[in-house]
């Protein structure tokens, strides 16, 4: 299993309930196919640098997970099919990126406490 990180932007016209349903849908998609969720972050509503689909903002979410490559292809296909997703980007994490992500999560945890 490889280590991946996906950031996706949801349409800003969605209600809070619709956003939670969408995030839960994608999380369940991964876990039902044997993925191990490492981290899940809600970055909230953020202004974008440029308009996407005539929208100036979007709900940003980040998933960090371990999964097999063939499941990742199906996961990205689900993003493309869902109208609520405006953009997404998935990157494979190497050992340096994994350690950086762990430090970032620890720093976030210490600032929230």
Curated annotation (Swiss-Prot):
Q: Which InterPro entries match?
A: Ribosomal_bS6 (IPR000529), Ribosomal_bS6_sf (IPR035980), Ribosomal_S6_plastid/chlpt (IPR020814), Transl_elong_EF1B/ribsomal_bS6 (IPR014717)
Per UniProt, the keywords (alphabetical) are: Ribonucleoprotein, Ribosomal protein, RNA-binding, rRNA-binding
Q: Which CDD domains match?
A: bS6
Q: Which GO terms describe its cellular component?
A: cytoplasm; ribonucleoprotein complex; ribosome
Pfam families listed in its UniProt record: Ribosomal_S6
Q: Mark the transmembrane ranges.
A: none
Cite the GO molecular-function annotations of the record. small ribosomal subunit rRNA binding; structural constituent of ribosome
Q: Set out the biological process GO terms recorded for this chain's protein.
A: translation
Described purpose of this protein according to its UniProt entry: Binds together with bS18 to 16S ribosomal RNA.
Q: Which family does it belong to?
A: Belongs to the bacterial ribosomal protein bS6 family.
NCBIfam families recorded: S6
What is the protein's name according to its record? Small ribosomal subunit protein bS6
Tell me what organism the protein belongs to.
Answer: Flavobacterium johnsoniae (strain ATCC 17061 / DSM 2064 / JCM 8514 / BCRC 14874 / CCUG 350202 / NBRC 14942 / NCIMB 11054 / UW101) (Cytophaga johnsonae)
